[in-house]
């Protein structure tokens, strides 16, 4: 979103930034979100060691659910491939994602439980203006994110077309479309998730999610 890029001091991208969240990150809309534990590989004689998450963050996003096989789709036909819409919480560990030496977006966003989806798949005929939906997130009862899908940098048609030119999309695939301002990383000082936090998030016409944050466990 335009205003999200501004809050984190990032320039507006000229093209969409693509990353993948694995199926192991998928969870239900009201399932617990588990803080991850990463690993620092050994260097020389120093042993590898586990590292607790310290910068896990929230991102409420509109999810586009694909309804038909889509490959190299022009923008003019992109909406034909939409089955409907859902809510996605694109939970992200910023240290794993953005570390100057070894940051990787998939590593930071692909941890177990980091992709709550739902509660519903609302078909596209029920959402007449997907590019004008209120979108919000609360943390422990305090409103953190409060935006609208009309401030997305790239619209739904552009995203479907762009992604489908690099990878074939199949029915059930979900494209998460970015987040409005109010993420923890953008606050001064930053505020990240910790054990016991509760996230509540929603989008007009798509329902609401609630997640408790728990510490890492096997």
Language-model segment annotations:
Residues 4, 12, 94-218:
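Catalytic-pocket segment enriched in acidic/His residues
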Residues 23-24, 67-71, 91-92, 124-126, ...:
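Short loop segments at secondary-structure junctions
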């Amino acid at each position: 979103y335009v205003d999200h890029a501004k809050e984190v001091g990032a320039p507006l991208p000229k093209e969409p930034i693509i990353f993948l969240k694995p199926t192991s990150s998928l969870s239900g809309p009201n399932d617990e979100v588990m803080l991850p534990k990463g690993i620092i590989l050994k260097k020389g004689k120093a042993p590898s060691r586990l590292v607790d998450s310290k910068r896990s963050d929230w991102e409420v996003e509109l999810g586009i659910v694909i309804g038909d096989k889509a490959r190299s789709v022009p923008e003019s036909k992109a909406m034909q491939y939409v089955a409907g819409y859902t809510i996605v919480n694109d939970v992200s560990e910023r240290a794993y994602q953005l570390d100057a030496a070894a940051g990787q977006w998939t590593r930071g966003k692909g941890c177990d439980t980091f992709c709550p989806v739902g509660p519903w798949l609302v078909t596209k005929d029920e959402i007449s203006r997907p590019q004008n939906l209120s979108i919000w997130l609360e943390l422990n009862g305090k409103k953190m994110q409060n935006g609208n899908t009309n401030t997305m940098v790239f619209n739904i048609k552009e995203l479907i077309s762009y992604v489908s030119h690099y990878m074939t999309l199949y029915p059930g695939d979900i494209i998460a479309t970015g987040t409005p301002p109010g993420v923890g990383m953008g606050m001064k000082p930053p505020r990240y998730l910790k054990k016991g936090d509760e996230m509540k998030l929603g989008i007009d016409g798509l329902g609401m999610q609630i997640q408790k944050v728990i510490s890492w466990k096997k």
